[in-house]
């Protein structure tokens, strides 16, 4: 069985080796953020969508929840920049889990006492805020069922897909 050491990015997330009984198919992973799509799964089992926008409860409460869609941003950097844009401390933002920087990802975020109208005005390169709703609860780390991954392998050897 052949063993190949993966690049640092894969080692960082726990992928320590590739194994194959055959010669392998070749190819490259994560050449573009769209090659690695990460969609958070809510505790209710809903897989977040990258594109559609679903409005929620519009009755103002303490927390605004929204879906953060980002391309090529890590979670902490995105929230730091977002906090500057809306003029509040980064500590007012909460999320269920961080997502890979070199990916196109969708994750739920909450922010305390920032109206959705202010968030809807934010324009950032490679970041979209959507699916706004109000809640009386903050998000907590780990408040998700998991993540759904879509991975594209580019440059696969001819005939390997068979």
Where are these regions (language model features)?
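Terminal domain-initiation and capping elements
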Residues: 1-162
């Amino acid at each position: 069985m052949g063993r190949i050491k993966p690049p640092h990015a894969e080692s960082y997330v726990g992928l320590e080796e590739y194994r194959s009984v055959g010669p392998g198919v070749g190819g490259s992973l994560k050449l573009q953020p769209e090659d690695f799509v990460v969609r958070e799964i809510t505790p209710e089992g809903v897989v977040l969508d990258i594109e559609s926008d679903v409005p929620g409860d519009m009755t103002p409460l303490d927390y605004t929840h929204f879906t953060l869609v980002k391309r090529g941003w890590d979670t902490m950097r995105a929230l730091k920049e977002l906090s500057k844009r809306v003029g509040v401390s980064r500590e007012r933002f909460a999320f269920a889990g961080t997502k890979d920087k070199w990916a196109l990802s969708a994750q739920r975020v909450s922010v305390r006492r920032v109206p959705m109208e202010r968030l809807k005005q934010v324009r950032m390169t490679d970041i979209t805020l959507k699916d706004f709703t109000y809640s009386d609860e903050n998000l907590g780390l780990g408040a998700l069922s998991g993540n759904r991954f879509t991975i594209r392998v580019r440059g696969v050897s001819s005939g390997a897909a068979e």
